[in-house]
């Protein structure tokens, strides 16, 4: 009669330790506390505002009109000599497609809001399949080369949870010679302190968190 498998050298006994009910309770409480901490931390982490007092205010042209109004207030209060609008093509079929690109659309909107035309520069980005924000930063770098202008520092005006990722990708696109600060306009569609309680807030924060992790760890120029 053959012996048990343990005797054949294929298996061996191990002692496994499981938490008691008190241990499971403590573990559950720790997970809940960590989850609540993450919920409170992640939105303001992504929607960062950290300006450096740059030589120009760069505005991502795709942001909504109320955010462009806020950008105009920041431009005037900060005493920036120029405002640079960036952005790629407006999608075909859009009512605003006649502008061609978001840089031109934002510039036109800001002029309507009262910003003098000679204070605005357009730096449109080409159509790309992915990494649109990085393409916007490269378009700005190309404009600087073409104009022979060197911006040692600039402040980027972005939108809500997109801000941290935008700053990261603009830094990569512009290189170490340009310091990049950032402003994050507030999204009016949800309460940032309870972003998980609305579909808009949940979708925006989770999408941007995943996109930021990709940009930080897997993006290659």
Specify the residue positions occupied by each region the protein language model found.
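A generic structural signal for solvent-exposed, polar alpha-helical segments
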Residues: 5, 86, 149, 201-202, ...
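N-terminal type II signal-anchor transmembrane helix
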Residues: 5-48
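A transmembrane-helix-recognition feature enriched in membrane-embedded lipid enzymes
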Residues: 197-221
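A structural signal for short, hydrophobic/glycine-enriched beta-strand patches
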Residues: 43-197
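Residue-level recognition of hydrophobic positions within alpha-helical transmembrane segments
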Residues: 18-20, 132, 203-204
